Regions:
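Long, His/Glu/Asp-enriched segments that create or flank divalent metal/ion-associated functional microenvironments
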Residues: 1-130
């Protein structure tokens, strides 16, 4: 796997990403789930996407509520991630139920978020494959 160019990596969402993936996000939630011997084995070790992602998105909002974002740019990064997810919902519906073309989905994304075109194209092509 190639190492990304650090000068082109967006670090504005770093704190939201940490809250989402680590503590109190996925890592914390999965650790508690797997340690809970009162749960049946199938509930301890299976991944429930809606629950897991819902929890992780909720933990991002805790960053603001608990004063964990160190500066306004990190909070902006969290809001940018929320916007990206909303755009994903529109694009997914457009592609899979409204008959959007690849180009329509790319143009919608470009018009509504500040991401590099190559990132948008890669995302759209991933949605098309799913």
């Amino acid at each position: 796997m190639p190492v990304p160019d650090a000068t082109k990596h967006n670090v504005v969402g770093g704190e939201a990403l940490f809250l989402h993936e680590a503590i109190p996000g996925h890592h914390y939630q999965i650790s508690l789930q797997q340690e809970d011997t009162l749960l049946p084995v199938f509930r301890r070790f299976l991944w429930y996407g809606a629950y897991g992602e819902g929890w992780a998105l909720y933990t991002e909002s805790l960053g603001k509520e608990l004063g964990l974002y160190t500066d306004p740019y990190q909070y902006f990064g969290m809001l940018t991630s929320e916007m990206h997810r909303a755009i994903r919902l529109v694009v997914d519906v457009g592609l899979h139920t409204k008959g959007w073309t690849r180009e329509q989905a790319i143009e919608y994304s470009k018009a509504n978020e500040a991401e590099p075109e190559e990132s948008i194209v890669a995302e759209i092509e991933r949605y098309m494959a799913i």
